[in-house]
Amino acid sequence: MESSKFVKIIWVFGIWILVFTFLIIYNNYDYKSTFGINKFEKRSLKTINQINNKENGDDKKLSVFLIPHSHCDGGWLQDYDGYYYNIVQYILSGVVNELNLDKEKKFNWVEIGFFSRWWNDQNEIQKEIVRNLINNKQLSFISGGWVQNDEATATIDDVITQMTQGHQWLKDTLNYTVEYAWQIDPFGYSSSTPTIFSSMGIKGLVINRVSNDVKSYMKSVKEMEFIWKGSESLGEQSQMLVSTLNIHYDYPKHIDPKKDFSLNDRIKGFTKYLNDLSKTRESNILMIPLGDDFRYSNAKTEFSVSKEWVKALQDNKEYYNIKEIKYATLDEYFIALEDSFLRNNKFGKSRKQNVYTETFSDGDDEVSALSLYNKDFFPYSTGNLEYWTGYYTTRPLLKRLIRESSLLQKSSDILYTLAIGENSNNQIDINNLQTLSNQLNENRNTIALVQHHDIVTGTSRSFVLNDNFQRLQKSRISNYNIISNSLEYLLNKSNNKTNNNNNNNNKNNNNNNNNNNNNNNNLKNTNSISTTGSSSSSGSGSSNNNNNTVNKSEPFNFENAIDLSNESNNQYSLVFHNTLGWEVNQHVSFRIKVNKNDNQLLESIQLVEAISNKTIQIQIIPIQDDSNCQSIENNYIVFAIINLPPLGLNTYYLSIANSEDSKSNFTYLSKPKLLKKGNEINFNNNRFKVEFESNGLISKITDKNSNEIKTIEQTFHQYSTKKSGPYIFNVKGGKKHGFLENPDKFIYHDGPLVSQLTMLYGVDDYCNVTSIVVQRIYKNNNEINNSNSKSLITENYIETGYSINGDMNRETTINYKVKDLENDDIFYTDNGLESRKRIYNHDRSVNQNYYPVLGYIKLKETSENNNHQYTVYVDRSVGATSPSDGEMEIMIHRTMDTDDWKGVNWPSKDIGRSDAKLYFNMDLVNNQLQNEKRISLHITNQPIMFVKKHNNQTGYLLKYSPLSNQLPSNIHLQSLLTLKNNTVGLRLFNIHEVDSNTQSTTDTDKSTLFNELEISNFIETGLSFLKLTKNNLIDKFSTRINKKFPIKCGESEYSFINEKPSSIIFSNNGTNNIIDGENKGENNKTIETIQIKPHEIKSFTFNFNFQLDQIIPNNNNNNNKYAINKELNNEYIEQSIENQRYEYDFSFFPIKPTFYDDRGKYNRPNHLALILSLSIGIPAGILIIVIALVVTYKKRKNRKTLTSSNSSSNLIQQEDQTDYSP
């Protein structure tokens, strides 16, 4: 019996061993988690790993960097305030508490807008904890922008602004400088990103949303880490080390705290994930994101779950072939990655390598190299024809308002900065102006906020977009106020230090009086406004220094329409501000309102340039002609050609003459001419002759410079689809239809300055017109000196304005088709810094060939006999393509009642009206190399006009420029703004648009930058105005170009890397100290030469020289009659301006966004239920019908049979009753 039991035990034990072995081998059973690993097993594993490491090298062991983070959108499904109060404040408080309790824990934070708000809510104890966490390198800031910006629809100016706002706050508040970036949610990536970020001192970048097929390829060839070159012209200067996330920025599945896995399953799944991940990388340095959207709202729970499996892996690193695994900052990861690449010359440069070939040699040994990528990552696709190209255009009105508000912010920054500089010797004025600084910074924060990748893209819930629209309105009103007060402090001569220098500048002032139009030097010492509108010739530049009274009840205001009704005894000062660093001669337009049918008054309107007392030509066009539409009744457009000094101001008087015989020879009132067809007229100016089809759209253009005649087919179209959404443009199952093909009315206006053809569609009542198209060409009446020698910049394009509503389930385009143009499917789009090459792929549908456009799209002829370029400039971000040779297609509006289920979970129902303009140019390629960027900058930096009704005002400057001369033609003054402590920030951009008669190097040593503003501490900085740092590692990497990479276009159009940089010479007039980037300088006259490469943006900071010995003391007895009156301006503007503002001069309707309340859950159509219902319902219905027919048939047959039977019975009965008797 005992032997029998023993045998059974042996059998059971043997079977158990076999089963256990089977589980280990075939089911990957984790026996160590059941029994643990004893010392013998650990020694055995250690021995095995030592053998493996000896064979493969210790570098084969994995270094795992766990990156805790929370992706906090600045608006998406909730608005900014909602996210902060409901989630973000708890995330930050919880994370800080957890990090403070455990020094091993780390956290990475991106969105400084949220963090700064949270910081302001904390007490000093909590703030000190944060400082300690930063010092302990537990809390890290990555990217450091105010938000995480979009890369397709945000302009480079706005991207730089939002990054600068974050970087400046971090430096000022926490003395923190960001070194690595985390762009993990934008829907595709622009090549401008590595250029901009590297110029800010950022050394490495993490990206995520790369198209599925591209990312799969990158994994297969181990190119998830690569060097990204943003610009061919800048070379290594624009390069950055990039690491791509494996799948997404969320937790890997098995370690997600929200997933219900046991510890064993977590470890087993995660280690398998690590093994798979390592096969896609050249390095054994692995980065694992621990987070997702708005994670760590319960930081204690999230950290406790991860702490458990991290500890288990740390205790058994040898077994899992892990060198280290830990919570980490992004800085730690990149430092380890860089070290791994450079260690043992793995990716280091050798003496004999060629960095642009695929193979490198060092003697007989092959040296590996990192992939060098020189394109962008557009469009973004998630497969199944899901191309994220719709958001390039989604919410076109919002995109325009953001760009428009950004320009207003730029004007506000410039004028405030100059007002500070001009009043630097008056403490009272400085104190008054500085009360505006907080407003100014808050307005910048608003511009920064709307660059978020779900705001400027239009891909948030509608109520969220409405919240941002309201923020933009508020910032505009605030900027109106800042500009208004800055103008007072700039132009009121007794209010700045100009008068203190008058005696030293009489000679210059007299020269200016003798040559008003040609000399921009010393414009601050010009004449003052007088009550008669004439100019004083006083050498001191003041008509009456003892009577400098200012009517503060009438500030400089932004006006929608200047009301000239019953104002014959008054005149207006129109002050135009030029935000460009070049002198501007161009057409401008503004609205006026007069009494009904008062042609005599209209013909008596005069516009006089104040500085020269010279009446200039104007042309007046009515906005409506024959209706009773009250909203625009008696509204007119006034056109004029004005001259503006670089970065400066010029004043014009708008008045009505008193005399009955006051008809002005310089005022042309255009009478409307109703046409039956659009081809009854042509347009002509110095540059072009334009002919039209019968429907009023462009048909032919003649370039008078080259005598080239081209047939241009201009058309509107609409795609109909039910598969698109806020993000996705999907033409599958849809059709392309003609749109705006037959206008109901043609109205033609002509004159000396403008030819205009207006087409109206859907006209029942003029007020209810559905769509408007306005064709316009600008003409030069030779009022500007030297205008005969060169066309005005506004003459270089044909302008097409349109006003259309969003049609449901329609995506509207405008197309330009150049006949007989061979461009070999190649076209170019502007990314804000430079043009990028695109190739239309005919194997893909049109939506897969759309690309983002910030400034323009263009075609170039590739045939040998032609060298023409065709460019369409845009006024906002759009999507565009070239679907056939010679054709440019631009999407201008889209709306749908379906969602694409990419997270918004609500349809993008944008039925609102969008008023916009496009600008068509044709020219020689060489001419456009010089002009295209300048034209684009002029279009997006239109002069800003402010109005003052003046009566008994004296002592005002009439013309002003802070620059002694305009900047070289290829140097764009991108930014001038005041930072903290009155430090001034300056950015200069070499757009490489050089004069055809000059070389690429521009030398401006004959001038200084600023006219009389004395500056000190001139320092070159990074792009966000922090200390200039160079990435010393980037030029140590060996690189190669993978010609098999699946993205085949997106590279720079031109490379100017071998051309010399432009030279800008700064002088400090021999009075102050100018210090270069290395903090060298002398206290005497210093000349500073700045070299700016083509396509490079350089940044500087400096201080205005506050002359303390001349500062007026601030005391209570001083009567400050120039005190800022912010309340008045705000009240005026809020009530009469911003709420009833027109987008363009031709607009019939005020701006009216169509936002709606889409909070909560959207009831998604149940397509499966519909299919099942139809699948079951249709056969069932047919069956019921068949049954009914059969039953009916049988009933009828039975009834017929019964009737026949009854008839037979009756007949028999009758026969039986028949009398046969004779």
Swiss-Prot record:
The record ties this protein, via InterPro entries, to:
Gal_mutarotase_sf_dom (IPR011013), Glyco_hydro/deAcase_b/a-brl (IPR011330), Glyco_hydro_38_C (IPR011682), Glyco_hydro_38_cen (IPR015341), Glyco_hydro_38_cen_sf (IPR037094), Glyco_hydro_38_N (IPR000602), Glyco_hydro_38_N_sf (IPR027291), Glyco_hydro_57/38_cen_sf (IPR028995)
A GO MF label: alpha-mannosidase activity
Quickly give the catalysed reaction: Hydrolysis of terminal, non-reducing alpha-D-mannose residues in alpha-D-mannosides
Q: Where is this region: Disordered?
A: 493-554, 1202-1222
Active-site residues, as the UniProt record annotates them: D185
Q: Where does the protein end up?
A: Membrane
The residue range of the signal peptide is 1-21
**A single GO cellular-component term on record:** membrane
Q: Pfam family of this protein, just one? A: Alpha-mann_mid
- The primary gene name is manD
Q: Which protein family is it in?
A: Belongs to the glycosyl hydrolase 38 family.
One GO term of the biological process aspect: mannose metabolic process
Q: What name does UniProt use for this protein?
A: Alpha-mannosidase D
Residues that bind Zn(2+), according to the entry?
H71, D73, D185, H453
Q: Which residues lie on this side of the membrane: Cytoplasmic?
A: 1192-1222
User: Which stretches are transmembrane?
Assistant: 1171-1191
* Stretches of the chain found on the membrane's Extracellular side: 22-1170
Major location, coarse class?
A: membrane
Q: Enzyme class, one word?
A: hydrolase
How does this protein lie in the membrane? Single-pass type I membrane protein
Query: Which note does the record give on the cofactor?
Result: Binds 1 zinc ion per subunit.
Superkingdom assignment: Eukaryota
Q: Which residues are glycosylated?
A: N175, N492, N496, N547, N551, N566, N613, N665, N768, N785, N952, N981, N1069, N1084
Q: Where is the composition biased (Low complexity)?
A: 493-549, 1202-1211
**What's the EC number here?**
3.2.1.24
* Co-factor requirement: Zn(2+)
Q: Does the keyword Hydrolase apply?
A: yes
